[in-house]
Amino acid sequence: MAAVDDLQFEEFGDGATLLAANPDATTINIEDPSVSFGHQPRPPGSVGREEDEELLGNNDSDETELLAGQKRSSPFWTFEYYQTFFDVDTYQVFDRIKGSLLPVPGKNFVRLYIRSNPDLYGPFWICATLVFAIAISGNLSNFLIHLGEKTYHYVPEFQKVSIAATVIYAYAWLVPLALWGFLLWRNSKVMSMVSYSFLEIVCVYGYSLFIYIPTAVLWIIPQRVVRWVLVMIALGVSGSVLVMTFWPAVREDNRRVALATIVTIVLLHVLLSVGCLAYFFDAPEMDHLPAAITTPNQTVTAAKSS
């Protein structure tokens, strides 16, 4: 066992005395700014784990967390609160549009594309574009149906814009609001149900309407069969997005309640599609168009024979 004297602290002399005793010793000045000290050695495998966390987005800085906290803490009546829902880049919007056009079987649109970051930019402009696409295409369709009639005078129907806006925006906001309230009520009874926020549901409905923009443009074709084929394709694509998104939210509920919810979602979607086609494009004059053209010829033929 060591003696007590061996455990005493020993005071060293100054640097000059030590250098005089050992002139070949290497010296480093820690106050020299040109000297850099390496990092402490890390345990094996720690570098790989840090790189993995960086790729997964788990290694967030304190500044990012602070900014995120400030971003989420704005009151709902301020402009800054709603500004966060328009803070998306072009890649995110295009990726969500692609997801609504090419739904992946068995994949949830909210979990796959929205990822707890819903936006209102895409749904707002999709609905606005769809309103003008339906109104303008409906006017052009009516013009093409009566093209060539001498007694027909084209008058733009501007009221179609307001009607289309009322229908589209009411569907894109009121239906998600009712669905959100229903899911919230059922979630209080069945705790294992998947829950969505109101803005996530609005985001799903908004992006699911994108396919109707090219469909509305193609509805100008004055062929009823073509129009119904187009509406069935649009219904199949957009309806599958809604079903695959909301089925996980209700499948843990009572079987009848779950099926009734999905059927209601699909029926409202069908009602919107068929209603827009019937009101804005499928004009009653199409059925009487051949009679209106042949009637003058028959009158002229009868006059000549007499």
Curated annotation (Swiss-Prot):
Positions annotated with a glycan in the UniProt record: N297
Keywords: Endosome, Glycoprotein, Golgi apparatus, Membrane, Transmembrane, Transmembrane helix
GO molecular function: small GTPase binding
Location, primary (coarse class): Golgi
Lumenal-facing ranges: 141-162, 222-227, 278-306
GO-annotated biological processes: vesicle-mediated transport
Location within or outside the cell: Golgi apparatus, cis-Golgi network membrane; Golgi apparatus, trans-Golgi network membrane; Late endosome membrane
Name assigned to this protein: Protein YIPF1
Phylogenetic classification of the source organism: Eukaryota, Metazoa, Chordata, Craniata, Vertebrata
Recorded name of the encoding gene: Yipf1
